[in-house]
Amino acid sequence: MAPPPVRLEIPAIGVAARLVRLGLEPGGAMQVPGDFTTAGWFAGGPRPGQLGPAVIAGHVDSRTGPAVFFRLRELRSGDVVLVDRADGARLRFVVEGARSFSKAGFPTAAVFGPAPSAALRLITCAGDFDRASGHYLDNLVVFARLAA
């Protein structure tokens, strides 16, 4: 098993953040970081660098302003995502694209399911904000692959 990831850097959008471990909520949904300045990696799936999609989530904003993934929507194909692991290795991923999905129709298999190589998914909230529920209606998913 690969060492856990500890830090995320996305130079194109100015992200440099500590990574925390995320599990599942009692209802089965993936946890989100408790801190708006950190991102979290899903410990129930592959770790960055392992075969399959490693998933990292972060907040887009908070009541006080922008959060760690506020500018995630600005990423374009070819942008670089760097993940530092606990063993000192730095992994380089290249963005392949991004898509917004309704939370009600979230493509769990496409995001969390098997992949033919080491991949990375970055997830944050997007779309309209529902004031009644206190949540965004969509998720933005950035798809990236491990650079050779």
Regions found by a protein language model. Name each.
Residues 1-77, 82-89, 97-148:
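Solvent-exposed, non-transmembrane regions of membrane-associated and secreted proteins
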